[in-house]
Amino acid sequence: VLSNVELVEDTELRYINGNVLTGKTVSPNGFLGFYNNNLSVLKEGNNYKLFGWIPFINNKVPSIYKTSFSWLSNGRPKDYDTNLNGEERAFVATGEMENVFPMDIYPMQLIKECLIGDIEKMEKLGIYEVSPEDFGLIDYSSSSKIEAQTIIREGLDYLYKETQ
């Protein structure tokens, strides 16, 4: 996240209406939403590195897990951008989603049920108590790189449509 830094014209930037985890991308000439009180600016992650998905190559890649050497350099600035450092992967039951989720439910199982569309299991897993914004930290920290917020939004829309 750029803060107290001059915006360089040569750098390609992404403007986000709202915060980094739950905001929407807007154009540079866009506007701040009615319910938002901040505009986030990140460097665009168009610079793909050879074997960028290997965690030990670059120690400037931010990670909340000790899969890269970036945790050794806590005081040094990290290079935050929009690059995913890999592509979407399969769900792996490591417990990382449960560690960062703010509620006491099973987020991975709920996401899977939203993908399947099983309303009864979605209700048992607590779909009525969540909103897509609750899954923002999962989108950032999950090694599966699955868009959990989008899946939950589609699950809630499906639930609303089927119960009407």
Identify the meaning behind each predicted range:
Residues 1-164:
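Redox cofactor-anchoring modules in respiratory/redox and cofactor-processing assemblies
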